[in-house]
Amino acid sequence: MRYPKQIGRLSLPGRKVQLATVAMLMAATMAACGQDGGTEASAPKAPADIPELTKDPLTLSFIWFDWPPAKALEDFANAEYTKERSNVTIKVNTVPNANWHDAMFTQFAARKTDFDIPILDSQHIGEAVTNGNILDITDFVKKNIDVDAYNPYLLAAYGQFPQAETGQRDENASLYGLPLLGDTWTMIYRKDLIGDKPPQTWDEMIAVAEKCQTDNPGVSGLAFHQANGSDAAAVTYNTVNGVYGGKLWDSKTRKIEGVINDAAGQEAMDVLVNKMKPLTAAGSGNWFIDEVNAAVAQGKACIAFNWIAASGGLLDPKESTLGTTREEILEKLGFATLPKQKTDLVPLGGMGMHVSAYSPAAQQAEALNFMKWFEQADIQKKWAAAGGVPSRTDALESPEFLNAQPFNQVYADSVSRMRDMWNVPEYARLIDIENTNVNAALNGAKNPKDALNDIAKEQQGVLDSAGGKGGGGL
C-alpha cells in the first residue's frame, strides 16, 4: 500500500515534467472521476505517446494475488527495469486469491486506488471497462507495441473488450491491457506409477487413475481444484465441459440456460462428480492450487491438474518427498498437455496488466513506459528465464522459455487449444454461482443434475437482469 509522504519543494525540471505529464493525462483522469455529465462510464483514453517521465523517486505499485509469480515479477522488475529507470521501485502488493477481485474493485468503486497497475483476469476486463476503472490503451498500443509478435487470441484475451469468439481478435476493437503472464492447466503424472506415456484421452486418464489408486494404497488417483472460492471449482467443471463437447453459453444471444446444461454439459457433470471425484482424497472437497501441489509433492496423487505458473515448486527438493534433487523428482514426475476427448480444449489462464484510471499522472506515465519495456522481445525472454510465462510468440518459442521448466513446452503446445469463460461485466456473479453449485455437487450437498440446472437458471437470471451486451468466449 502506498502511503502519503511529505513532499518538499520540487526542482524546476521536476515541476516541468509533472506539469507536462498532468496535461497529457488530465482528460483521462477527469473521465475516470465521473466527469461525464452523468452518462454511463467508459474507459478513459491513454495518450499514444508516453508523457515525459519524472526524475524524482517513484514507486510503481501492482496488485495481484499471493502466489509465486507475484514474487518473481517483483524481483525481476526491480532487477531489470531499474537498469532503465533507476529512480523507480516496483512493488507487487498481494492479497489472498479469494479476495483478489474484491480487493481491486472495492478501490475502483471508491475511485481511488493504492495501486497503479492492476493485474486482471481476462474476465475482469469487462467490469473494469464499463465502470471506467482502467485506461483505454488502444492508441498507445498502436504506437508502441508490435502486435504482430503475438498470437492474436492471447492479445485479445488479456486486453480486448468486447471479447471476440475464441481464437479471433477484432482488429477494430479497443485494447485495455497487455499480456503479463500466460497460463493453462498441465496434467502432472507419476511416471514411476503409471509409466512414461501420459493418458491421451479423458476416459483413459480416469481409467489409469483408478488402476493406479487400486495398485497403490494411500495414493489417490486424482487431485484437482474443488474449492468454492476464486474460480476453482468452476474452472474444473468448465474444463471437463469443454473436452466432452459442451459450451458455457451462446455469447451472441447471451443464452446460458439450455446451453451449459444440455446433454454434453450433463455428461461432463456426471463424469466430474461420479467418475473423477471418487478418485480424490478424503477431505479434498475444498482443495485449490496449494493443496493440489502439496498432494503431488508428498507423493499422494497419481495424476493431478494445476496451473503451469504455480507448478515450479514441485521441483524443489525442499518441498518434495519424491527426490533429494530436481533430477530425482523429474524421474518420477511428468508434465503433459491435457487429454482430449470429444474436443481438445484447455482452459485459458494467465492475466494481463492494465493502468488504473485513478493513479496520479506520473504513475500512469510510468505504467505505460513499463508496459512498453516489458513487452520487448529481449525482456520477454528474460522474463521467461526468470520463471514467467510470456505471450510473445518469439519468446514462447525461445530456448530461454522452453528449457527453463519441463512444463513450459506444455504451455507452448496448449495455446492453440485454449478457451476462456464469459468476458462480461457480470463475470463475478456468474463465477460465484458456478463455484457454489459445482462445489456442492462435488461434496454431495446437491444432486449433480440439479446443480447444473441451477447454475443455468441462476446465471441466465443474472444476464437477463443486466440486459447488457458484449463479451465473448465459449
Residue map of PLM features:
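Glycine-centered hinge/linker elements that transmit conformational signals in sensory
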Residues: 208-209, 253-286
